[in-house]
């Protein structure tokens, strides 16, 4: 498609999305490749300049693991789930809030736009409870494992986000929550993004990842559009598996609770965020009712 055709195709979408709220979950290789992250941030800033209200939520699992190893603490996983003891949580907060969040805010500032970095602790944005012990398969047996300071979101108070958006800031949210006794908890970033989108009555939720979207069983074709019932059937049939399941489950919950559409997009490809939102076919998977 010619560049001028892309621009003309974008116009009605820009008009339709003006004033709408979009929650973007930053994840995948973009979190460890500075050039990819810079491109994604520029695209997010463009959305702000064309009139959308943008909220960014980021993860940071690989960076947390690297920092732990650098500090001589070996990360512990059981059945693919991280064990988060108090020291691990302290390191996670250091990485998520002190490094990644600040870095994203700085990139946004370099693009000439104002941003504020917060975590779920701020303004009681994310209230959570400690996750119950999980049954996971270890070898050939099932074990019940206490994951430590890992939380499940119980409540979202979006007031702090509304205040920032009203003042034309881009909020950048680190996935740390607080429980009702004041203890900090690590939260899955996909879940945090979905819950924030629901609380804000966002128009769109976009999950940026390392894959092109939801693929067919042969991994040769991307489903550009899926209804909730289709996605549920594909999970049940095993077509959707592995790490895509929690991402899609967050998207599905958002759509069930009022978000007009949720998208899974490969954030490693240049300007995919814009192409997904502003072209007819898109480049990832869009999930709707």
Swiss-Prot record:
* Superkingdom: Archaea
Read off the SUPFAM superfamilies from this record: Carbamate kinase-like (SSF53633)
Q: Which reaction does it catalyse?
A: N-acetyl-L-glutamate + ATP = N-acetyl-L-glutamyl 5-phosphate + ADP
- Per the UniProt record, the site (Transition state stabilizer) maps to 25, 247
Q: Where in the cell is it found?
A: Cytoplasm
Give the record's keywords alphabetically: Amino-acid biosynthesis, Arginine biosynthesis, ATP-binding, Cytoplasm, Kinase, Nucleotide-binding, Transferase
Against Pfam families, the record matches this protein to: AA_kinase
Task: Please name the GO terms of the biological process aspect recorded for this protein, alphabetically.
Answer: arginine biosynthetic process via ornithine; L-arginine biosynthetic process
Q: Where does substrate bind?
A: 60-61, 82, 186
Q: What is its EC number?
A: 2.7.2.8
Q: What InterPro entries would the database entry show?
A: AceGlu_kinase-like_sf, AcgluKinase_fam, ArgB, Asp/Glu/Uridylate_kinase, Glu/AcGlu_kinase, NAGK-C
Name the major location.
cytoplasm
Q: One GO CC term of this entry?
A: cytoplasm
The GO molecular function terms of this record are:
acetylglutamate kinase activity; ATP binding
Q: In which pathway does it act?
A: Amino-acid biosynthesis; L-arginine biosynthesis; N(2)-acetyl-L-ornithine from L-glutamate: step 2/4
Residues annotated as transmembrane = none
In terms of PANTHER family, this protein maps to:
N-ACETYLGLUTAMATE SYNTHASE, N-ACETYLGLUTAMATE SYNTHASE, MITOCHONDRIAL
Q: What family does the Swiss-Prot or TrEMBL record give for this protein?
A: Belongs to the acetylglutamate kinase family. ArgB subfamily.
Q: What is the purpose of this protein?
A: Catalyzes the ATP-dependent phosphorylation of N-acetyl-L-glutamate.
Name used for this protein in its record? Acetylglutamate kinase
Give the source species.
Methanoculleus marisnigri (strain ATCC 35101 / DSM 1498 / JR1)
């Amino acid at each position: 498609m010619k560049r001028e055709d892309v621009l003309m195709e974008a116009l009605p979408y820009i008009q339709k999305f003006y004033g709408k709220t979009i929650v973007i979950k930053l994840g995948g290789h973009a979190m460890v490749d500075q050039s990819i992250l810079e491109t994604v941030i520029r695209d997010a800033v463009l959305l702000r300049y064309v009139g959308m209200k943008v909220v960014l939520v980021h993860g940071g699992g690989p960076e947390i693991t690297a920092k732990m190893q650098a500090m001589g603490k070996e990360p512990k996983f059981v059945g693919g789930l991280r064990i988060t003891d108090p020291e691990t949580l302290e390191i996670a907060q250091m990485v998520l809030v002190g490094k990644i969040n600040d870095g994203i805010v700085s990139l946004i500032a370099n693009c000439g736009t104002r941003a504020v970095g917060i975590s779920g602790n701020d303004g009681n944005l994310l209230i959570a409870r400690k996750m119950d012990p999980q049954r996971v398969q270890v070898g050939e047996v099932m074990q019940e494992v206490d994951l430590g300071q890992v939380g499940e979101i119980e409540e979202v108070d979006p007031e702090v986000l509304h205040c920032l958006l009203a003042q034309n800031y881009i909020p950048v949210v680190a996935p740390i929550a607080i429980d009702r006794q004041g203890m900090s908890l690590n939260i899955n970033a996909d879940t945090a993004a979905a819950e924030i989108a629901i609380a804000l009555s966002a128009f769109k939720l976009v999950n940026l990842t390392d894959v092109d979207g939801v693929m067919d069983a042969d991994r040769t074709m991307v489903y550009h559009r899926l209804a909730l019932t289709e996605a549920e059937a594909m999970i049940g049939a095993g077509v959707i598996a592995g790490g895509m399941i929690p991402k899609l489950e967050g998207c599905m919950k958002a759509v069930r609770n009022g978000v007009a559409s949720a998208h899974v997009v490969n954030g490693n490809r240049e300007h995919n965020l814009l192409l997904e939102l502003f072209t007819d076919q898109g480049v990832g998977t869009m999930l709707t009712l």
